[in-house]
Amino acid sequence: MTYLVWAAVFAMFVVVLLGYFLGCLNGSVLVSHFIIRDDVRQHDSGNAGLTNFYRTYGARYALLVIACDMLKAVAAVSLAAWLGARFDPRMLPDLPLTAAEQAEYVLHFKYWAGFFCVVGHMFPCTAKFRGGKGILCSATLTLLLDWRIALVCWSLFAVLWL
């Protein structure tokens, strides 16, 4: 029985690390460093987010940042779903998990990877824990995890912000 618990803990730990380190890949820092050859954190508000990047460099490069931030969220959730679909803590090929049990593992893995992807975006260990605000990453994750919740959240955001 303890093996089953430790297998689940280890698998969740791998998913959490995967989500966090994918989140640490901040799109605005990567684009400003490798394409523009500058550091976005040295300008305007000093934040490594999309808003500061847009204010500093304009819309042309901001689309690359949007793509990077959305792709890292998609990658974190997709890899977590892939790992969750292959995860069976019992290691019994004769008695596989039911579809409901497997779907529950996949859902839990996706939520944990997504949450830690946002945490990695906001507090990246690669940038002295100074990251973005996590808005675009969170919006992408809500769309990936449940489109109905994303629709409600985005509508409220549009009404309150605009």
Identify the meaning behind each predicted range.
Residues 1-11:
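N-terminal membrane topogenic signal
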Residues 4-6, 51-56, 102-104, 130:
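Helix-boundary and loop/linker segments of multi-pass membrane transporters
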Residues 10-36:
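N-terminal signal-anchor transmembrane alpha helix
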Residues 11, 15, 61-65, 71-126, ...:
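Nucleotide and nucleotide-moiety/phosphate-recognizing core
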Residues 24-30, 129-137:
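Transmembrane helix boundary and interhelical junction motifs in multipass membrane proteins
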Residues 29-62, 131:
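Cytosolic, membrane-interface loops and tails of multi-pass inner-membrane proteins
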Residues 54-58, 116, 120, 134-162:
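Interfacial segments of multi-pass membrane proteins
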